[in-house]
């Protein structure tokens, strides 16, 4: 990892490309292309094993955008034990979210697998990676999008009329195709997207629903032209954990007892993985 750290902290003549698989190098290029990153501080590494990987946490980088907008992201590297190559990388979850998941009385593999998925999910939105989002949402995903209307003004002659009620939330259900079309348009209008997960509540299915996870987090969304603060609930089918699928994605401004993590498993995802509209 020292070569990679050096590439951020100074002008390094070391070729770091051999440390990455092709797919991981592509992910790395997306990260270094975002916000002119520099090393925020000397990394303090911790390590965990997940199947064939060693998870290396974390390298803090500072991102700088127009308007003096700055963020620090901790980058997680997942290294193959045998080849010693980095197979994937992502932005780390918040300490509170990670701590909550690790406190669950599940086996360590389940906890680390869920954390890894959420890191990838969050990173995809931060990097505006439509390809990943398309891959990870099931074709029949149940998607509810909430948008906080911002106050806007439009002039008619010399009069100014308020068009939208500031703070009003509009909820819309979309198909996967509709959601991705709108999301792509939204991403194209943004210089950056910064998403944080807090106040995490997670649950997992058992017996016939083993491998189904539900996650409810407070999502703090901030970009150069839009921001909101709400509750994101996901139902994730990880029965094939190599190719996990988001089967439910619901955003609400306030926490709703209809969409707790546990109830999401029981009420929305059937044992066959199909979606119920009830």
Kindly give the residue locations of the regions a language model identified.
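Short, low-complexity N-terminal intrinsically disordered segments enriched in polar/charged residues
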Residues: 1-10, 83-127, 135
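Short, well-ordered alpha-helical segments enriched in acidic and aromatic residues
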Residues: 1-32, 128-156
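Surface-exposed, charged secondary-structure patches
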Residues: 24-81, 157-228
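A mature extracytoplasmic/lumenal domain signature
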Residues: 61, 90-93, 137-140, 147-148, ...
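Short beta-strand edge/turn micro-motifs at domain boundaries
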Residues: 66-110, 206-214, 222-278
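Conserved small-residue-rich
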Residues: 110-172
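Loop/turn elements at helix/coil->beta-strand transitions in domains of secreted/extracellular proteins
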Residues: 128-131, 193, 242-243
């Amino acid at each position: 990892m020292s070569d990679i750290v050096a590439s951020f902290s100074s002008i390094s003549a070391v070729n770091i490309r051999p440390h990455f698989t092709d797919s991981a190098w592509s992910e790395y290029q997306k990260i270094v292309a975002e916000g002119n990153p520099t090393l925020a501080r000397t990394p303090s590494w911790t390590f965990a094993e997940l199947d064939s990987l060693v998870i290396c946490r974390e390298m803090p980088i500072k991102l700088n955008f127009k308007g003096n907008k700055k963020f620090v992201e901790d980058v997680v590297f997942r290294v193959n034990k045998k080849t010693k190559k980095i197979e994937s990388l992502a932005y780390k979850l918040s300490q509170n979210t990670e701590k909550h998941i690790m406190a669950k009385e599940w086996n360590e593999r389940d906890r680390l697998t869920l954390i890894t998925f959420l890191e990838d999910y969050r990173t995809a939105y931060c990097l505006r990676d439509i390809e990943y989002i398309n891959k990870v949402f099931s074709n029949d995903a149940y998607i509810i999008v909430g948008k906080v209307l911002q106050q806007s003004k439009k002039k008619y002659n010399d009069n100014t009329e308020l068009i939208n009620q500031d703070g009003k939330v509009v909820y819309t259900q979309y198909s996967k195709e509709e959601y991705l079309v709108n999301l792509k348009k939204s991403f194209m209008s943004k210089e950056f997207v910064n998403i944080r997960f807090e106040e995490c509540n997670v649950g997992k299915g058992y017996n016939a629903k083993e491998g189904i996870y539900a996650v409810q987090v407070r999502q703090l969304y901030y970009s150069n032209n839009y921001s909101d603060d709400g509750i994101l609930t996901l139902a994730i089918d990880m029965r094939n954990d190599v190719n996990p699928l988001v089967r439910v994605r619901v955003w609400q401004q306030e926490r709703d007892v209809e969409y707790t993590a546990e109830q999401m498993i029981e009420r929305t995802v059937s044992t066959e993985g199909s979606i119920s509209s009830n």
